[in-house]
Amino acid sequence: MNVRANRVSEQMKKELGDILNRKIKDPRLGFVTVTGVDVTGDLQEAKVFISILGTDKEKENTLLALEKAHGFIRSEIGRRIRLRKVPEMSFEIDNSIAYGNRIDELLRDLNNDQ
């Protein structure tokens, strides 16, 4: 990824966090955190990695809400970031936080057993 793509990625991460927490009023949208954004070098596509707190059903509902609000989110990004073309976004669940929590839990169990 080039320097410009990195800057756009960081700016999108910041703006997406704000949009998801303040602008979207969908009740299906649970506790969502934007953990990262990968933008292609030509700034045409962006993978948005999100962490969702809740059950699998709540995660599924949150993804549905994000897909429904996709156009609104894209237009908001276009208003906030000066780009010739707003990248096409896809949302993916980032399981690294859950994985880290599971490792912490296993380590605590191991320490309690000793």
UniProtKB/Swiss-Prot annotation:
Compartments in which it is found: Cytoplasm
InterPro entries given in the database record: KH_dom-like_a/b, RbfA, RbfA_dom_sf, Ribosome-bd_factorA_CS
Binding partners and assembly: Monomer. Binds 30S ribosomal subunits, but not 50S ribosomal subunits or 70S ribosomes.
Designated name of the protein: Ribosome-binding factor A
GO cellular component terms attached to this protein's record: cytosol
GO MF annotations, alphabetized: ribosomal small subunit binding
Family: Belongs to the RbfA family.
Organism: Listeria innocua serovar 6a (strain ATCC BAA-680 / CLIP 11262)
NCBIfam families recorded: rbfA
Statement: the UniProt record of this protein carries the keyword Transferase: no
One record GO biological process: maturation of SSU-rRNA
Main subcellular localisation: cytoplasm
UniProt keyword Cytoplasm present: yes
HAMAP family named in the record: RbfA
Key words, A-Z: Cytoplasm, Ribosome biogenesis
Described function: One of several proteins that assist in the late maturation steps of the functional core of the 30S ribosomal subunit. Associates with free 30S ribosomal subunits (but not with 30S subunits that are part of 70S ribosomes or polysomes). Required for efficient processing of 16S rRNA. May interact with the 5'-terminal helix region of 16S rRNA.
